[in-house]
């Protein structure tokens, strides 16, 4: 019965191991689980056999006691003294048979106990090996997942930095576009003013003469304004070209932002032809790319 009490903690530990091994997914872990289940069933079968042998010994002891009582009753009934020696001999034979039976049962119980002990040690060794393999596999999986996480984190950081740089560049381009729009408005005003002065000069050629010094100053100011305009145009064109190249080289980075990305749409540039009557009256373009030509006075 002491062996049976030692088996119960083993069953409890086996149930705990079973509960832990439920989460195993690979085939190797399923095989280990099946092996543990088979060992558990063998241990239970051996425990039942051990209990059955104990019960058999108890029943034999009871039967022996009953037979001894019957013998005593028969001796009391058959009280002749002539059979006293025969009764003693019979009693001695029964005692010897009972001792032989006890010896055989003891040997059987010892063999069963040894078998149970060996099975328990084997099961413990297999369970330890299975747990070690499972722990090693968990460590390897955790290491692999951490490495993948680091790679993903580095890639996300790189994409975020690239998007930040693109956003800064877009903001700078928007500022340049706004400056360009202001410059265009200013240039349009200058062209309108030049047109009006041209009409006034054509209407009154004899009554009004422009001083030579004032004309030179006015031309210098106009040349400076046109130079500033064309420098702003070149800066804006370079910014637009660089933005186009950057967006064409990295289409995936911008799509990663999804609906969170900033969609920067520049306002439409005012057309140079918006003042149609001014352009139709002039026979030459307002100014060349060099910024040195002037419209006819």
UniProtKB/Swiss-Prot annotation:
Protein name: Coiled-coil domain-containing protein 159
Function, as annotated: Functions during spermatid development; may participate in the centrosome reduction procedure of spermatids and is required for the formation of the connecting piece/sperm head-tail coupling apparatus (HTCA) and the correct and tight attachment of the flagellum to the nuclear envelope.
Domain of life, source organism: Eukaryota
Assembly, per entry: Interacts with DYNLT2. Interacts with GGNBP1. Interacts with OSBP2.
Keyword set, alphabetical order: Coiled coil, Differentiation, Spermatogenesis
PANTHER family in alphabetical order: COILED-COIL DOMAIN-CONTAINING PROTEIN 159, TRANSMEMBRANE PROTEIN CCDC163
Record InterPro entries: CCDC159/163 (IPR039284)
One of the GO BP terms on file: spermatid development
Keyword Coiled coil: yes
Disulfide bonds: none
GO cellular component: a single term: sperm head-tail coupling apparatus
Coiled-coil annotated residue ranges, if any: 147-297
Region (Disordered): 256-297
């Amino acid at each position: 019965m002491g062996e049976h009490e030692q088996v119960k903690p083993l069953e409890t530990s086996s149930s705990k191991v079973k509960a832990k091994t439920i989460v195993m997914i690979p085939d190797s872990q399923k095989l280990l689980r099946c092996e543990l289940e088979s060992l558990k069933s063998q241990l239970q079968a051996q425990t039942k056999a051990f209990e059955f042998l104990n019960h058999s010994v108890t029943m034999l002891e009871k039967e022996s006691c009953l037979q001894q009582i019957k013998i005593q009753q028969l001796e009391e009934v058959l009280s002749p003294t002539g059979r006293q020696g025969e009764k003693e001999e019979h009693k001695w034979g029964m005692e010897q048979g009972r001792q032989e039976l006890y010896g055989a049962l003891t040997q059987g119980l010892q063999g069963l106990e040894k078998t149970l002990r060996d099975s328990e040690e084997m099961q413990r060794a297999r369970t330890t090996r299975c747990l070690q393999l499972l722990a090693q596999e968990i460590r390897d999986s955790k290491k692999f997942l951490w490495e993948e996480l680091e790679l993903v984190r580095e890639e996300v950081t790189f994409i975020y930095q690239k998007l930040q740089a693109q956003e800064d560049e877009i903001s700078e381009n928007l500022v340049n576009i706004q400056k360009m729009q202001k410059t265009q408005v200013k240039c349009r005003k200058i062209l309108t003013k030049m047109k009006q002065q041209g009409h006034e000069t054509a209407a009154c050629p004899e009554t009004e003469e422009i001083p030579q010094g004032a004309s030179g100053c006015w031309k210098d100011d106009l040349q400076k304004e046109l130079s500033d305009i064309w420098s702003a145009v070149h800066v804006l064109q370079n910014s637009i070209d660089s933005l186009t190249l950057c967006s064409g080289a990295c289409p995936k980075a911008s799509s990663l932002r999804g609906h969170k990305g900033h969609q920067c749409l520049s306002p439409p540039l005012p057309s140079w032809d918006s003042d149609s009557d001014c352009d139709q009256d002039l026979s030459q373009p307002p100014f060349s790319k060099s910024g040195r030509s002037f419209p006819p006075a």
